[in-house]
């Protein structure tokens, strides 16, 4: 009985400390949510930063919604994507709805020889906002060596998800620094916050975008340039293969309206209150438990996908 008492006391303090830690994290989340989404206001995003906003991957999903939100604020829009037909359609929709000028640049971001064309097309434009949104992922979660067409997949994911962010920033940032104002919004992913097995290459490229953004923000915030890393969880987009939005998987429009409120308030954001809460909870998990959950979740999706493909 005497030896049990110290052990009971130790367990009590371990439990109390754990509860206190979780309570502190939840309190911090509520404070942050209130500051950002309750009281916050984006840092003057509009034509005063520069007439034009450039959006890569701007014909679908999150990219299209950013283009629409920026056009709503009176900015002229440059859409950069692969399909000229889709570019023409979205460009026409935006110009008619928001009465702003639009330009389109049709390029395939899986190629590395596109940036001279983009540079020439952007020459002379007063660019206030760059949204680096273009991206690609796996067809389904898979073990690294079993990823279909692995060598080509490695090259494509790095070229589209990581190289494009560096190259586009290289083209646009000098003008922002010269004018001492501008905003670069880099769309990373929650998969870049924590390693995601079975999406290894994708997760690694998104971690690159997150680190690149954080470093760049520290380098250039004194020059008047905001660089933001946006780290969403699931959004109902074609890339995520989610057809209908839910309370935790918002539509692109809902997500972007929420994320716009974080510009100038958070340099690193999940963009959406529920996503921020999930990130806070995930950060409190021990790594062994996180990886167990991540592997189980990814492998479940993998098995269902392969079973469906076999049936077809």
Swiss-Prot record:
Coiled-coil residues: none
Instruction: Specify whether Lipid biosynthesis is a keyword of the entry.
Output: yes
Q: What does this protein do?
A: Catalyzes the second of the four reactions of the long-chain fatty acids elongation cycle. This endoplasmic reticulum-bound enzymatic process, allows the addition of two carbons to the chain of long- and very long-chain fatty acids/VLCFAs per cycle. This enzyme has a 3-ketoacyl-CoA reductase activity, reducing 3-ketoacyl-CoA to 3-hydroxyacyl-CoA, within each cycle of fatty acid elongation. Thereby, it may participate in the production of VLCFAs of different chain lengths that are involved in multiple biological processes as precursors of membrane lipids and lipid mediators.
Positions contributing to NADP(+) binding: 50-79
Subcellular location(s) per record = Endoplasmic reticulum membrane
Q: How does it sit in the membrane?
A: Multi-pass membrane protein
- GO CC annotation: endoplasmic reticulum; endoplasmic reticulum membrane
Where does the signal sequence lie? none
GO molecular function annotation: estradiol 17-beta-dehydrogenase [NAD(P)+] activity; oxidoreductase activity; very-long-chain 3-oxoacyl-CoA reductase activity
Q: Which family does it belong to?
A: Belongs to the short-chain dehydrogenases/reductases (SDR) family. 17-beta-HSD 3 subfamily.
Which residues are involved in binding substrate?
Answer: 189
Domain characteristics, as noted in the entry: The di-lysine motif confers endoplasmic reticulum localization for type I membrane proteins.
Note the CDD domains from the entry. 17beta-HSD1_like_SDR_c (cd05356)
Q: What is its EC number?
A: 1.1.1.330, 1.1.1.62
Catalysed reactions listed for this entry: a very-long-chain (3R)-3-hydroxyacyl-CoA + NADP(+) = a very-long-chain 3-oxoacyl-CoA + NADPH + H(+); 17beta-estradiol + NAD(+) = estrone + NADH + H(+); 17beta-estradiol + NADP(+) = estrone + NADPH + H(+); 3-oxooctadecanoyl-CoA + NADPH + H(+) = (3R)-hydroxyoctadecanoyl-CoA + NADP(+)
The short motif Di-lysine motif is annotated over 308-312
Under which name does UniProt file this protein?
Very-long-chain 3-oxoacyl-CoA reductase
> Which InterPro entries does this chain map to?
NAD(P)-bd_dom_sf (IPR036291), Sc_DH/Rdtase_CS (IPR020904), SDR_fam (IPR002347), VLCFA-Steroid_DH (IPR051019)
Top EC category = oxidoreductase
Q: Name one GO biological process term.
A: fatty acid biosynthetic process
Starting at the broadest rank, the lineage of the source organism is: Eukaryota, Metazoa, Chordata, Craniata, Vertebrata
Q: Which Pfam families match?
A: adh_short (PF00106)
């Amino acid at each position: 009985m005497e030896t049990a008492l110290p052990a009971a006391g130790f367990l009590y303090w371990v439990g109390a400390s754990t509860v206190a830690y979780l309570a502190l994290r939840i309190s911090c989340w509520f404070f942050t949510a209130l500051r950002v989404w309750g009281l916050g206001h984006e840092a003057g995003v509009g034509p005063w930063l520069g007439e034009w906003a450039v959006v890569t991957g701007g014909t679908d999903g999150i990219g299209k919604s950013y283009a629409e939100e920026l056009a709503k604020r009176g900015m002229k829009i440059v859409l950069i994507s692969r399909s000229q037909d889709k570019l023409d359609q979205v460009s026409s929709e935006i110009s008619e709805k928001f009465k702003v000028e639009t330009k389109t640049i049709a390029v395939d971001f899986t190629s590395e020889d596109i940036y001279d064309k983009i540079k020439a097309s952007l020459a002379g434009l007063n660019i206030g906002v760059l949204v680096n949104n273009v991206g690609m992922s796996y067809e389904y979660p898979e073990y690294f060596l079993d990823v279909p067409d692995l060598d080509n997949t490695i090259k494509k994911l790095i070229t589209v998800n990581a190289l494009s962010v560096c190259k586009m920033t290289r083209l646009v940032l000098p003008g922002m620094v010269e004018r001492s104002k501008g905003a670069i919004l880099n769309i990373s992913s929650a998969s870049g916050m924590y390693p995601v097995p079975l999406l290894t290459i994708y997760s690694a490229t998104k971690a690159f975008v997150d680190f690149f953004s954080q470093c760049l923000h520290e380098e250039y915030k004194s020059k008047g340039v905001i660089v933001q890393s946006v780290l969403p969880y699931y959004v109902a987009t074609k890339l995520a293969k989610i057809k209908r939005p839910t309370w935790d998987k918002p539509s692109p429009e809902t997500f972007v309206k929420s994320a716009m409120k974080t510009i100038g308030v958070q340099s690193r954001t999940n963009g959406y209150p529920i996503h921020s809460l999930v990130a806070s909870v995930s950060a409190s998990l021990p790594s062994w438990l996180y990886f167990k959950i991540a592997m189980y979740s990814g492998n479940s999706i993998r098995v269902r996908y392969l079973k469906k493909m076999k049936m077809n």
